[in-house]
UniProtKB/Swiss-Prot annotation:
This is Cytochrome b6. GO terms for cellular component: plasma membrane-derived thylakoid membrane. Pfam families: Cytochrome_B. Heme b 2 binds at residues 89, 190. Coiled coil: none annotated. Heme c binds at residue 38. The gene is petB. It is a multi-pass membrane protein. GO terms for molecular function: electron transporter, transferring electrons within cytochrome b6/f complex of photosystem II activity; metal ion binding; oxidoreductase activity. Binds 2 heme b groups non-covalently with two histidine residues as axial ligands.
Length: 218
């Protein structure tokens, strides 16, 4: 590369970054691709916004049944731009779910789930389930009346499953009733387990798309 900087040359010598850049920028895009094929990318952007704003809120949120609600109130009223951070988190969560639904419809209607892209579709379905679980666990974290009763209802649903139902309810709640253990588990799921799971499946999803390319028109 003519007139390259010493820094660029240093990285190029060790990592061959120009080959990587050429591969990324020269990928063929089929002529039938339109704006509706951007819905998956928009969903990713929403997730990144969720990650950034959620990380910011962890500095102030206290995952205890006695302090959760007051810590959220403090974030909204006393922390500089705290109301904006939480509002963006909520808005982007709603937008992420909407974009995900539209993305699934687009893929289904254009046949993007067919051979040889079955695994890409399966990873997408798994990510959709994780996204719904994100919503359920996040909804409970303020630990207000709405959050408490939502947790009580949702965590009680597995009780209808034969044999293992009661065990699953106790596993979700951390005991026989909804309380501190429940909030701790939902907080851990929402801020650690699910983000990592979603990131892993996203990586698999993108690598398969990268390998197989965008599906053709109907």
């Amino acid at each position: 590369m003519a007139n390259s900087s010493p820094v660029y040359d240093w990285f190029q010598e060790r990592l061959e970054i120009q080959d990587i850049a050429d591969d990324v920028t020269s990928k063929y895009v089929p002529p039938h691709v339109n704006i509706f094929y951007c819905l998956g990318g928009i969903t990713l952007v929403c997730f990144l916004i969720q990650f950034a704003t959620g990380f910011a809120m962890t500095f102030y949120y206290k995952p205890t049944v006695t302090e959760a609600y007051s810590s959220v109130s403090y974030l909204m009223t006393d922390v500089s731009f705290g109301w904006l951070i939480r509002s963006v988190h909520r808005w982007s969560a709603s937008m992420m779910v909407l974009m995900l639904i539209l993305h699934v419809f687009r893929v289904y209607l254009t046949g993007g789930f067919k051979r040889p892209r079955e695994l890409t579709w399966i990873t997408g379905v798994v990510m959709a389930v994780i996204t719904v679980a994100f919503g359920v666990t996040g909804y409970s974290l303020p630990w207000d009346q709405v959050g408490y009763w939502a947790v009580k209802i949702v965590s009680g649903v597995p009780a209808a499953i034969p044999v293992i139902g009661d065990f699953m309810v106790e596993l979700l709640r951390g005991g026989e009733s909804v309380g501190q253990s429940t909030l701790t588990r939902f907080y851990s799921l929402h801020t650690f387990v699910m983000p990592w799971l979603l990131a892993v499946f996203m990586l698999m999803h993108f690598l398969m798309i990268r390998k197989q390319g965008i599906s053709g028109p109907l």
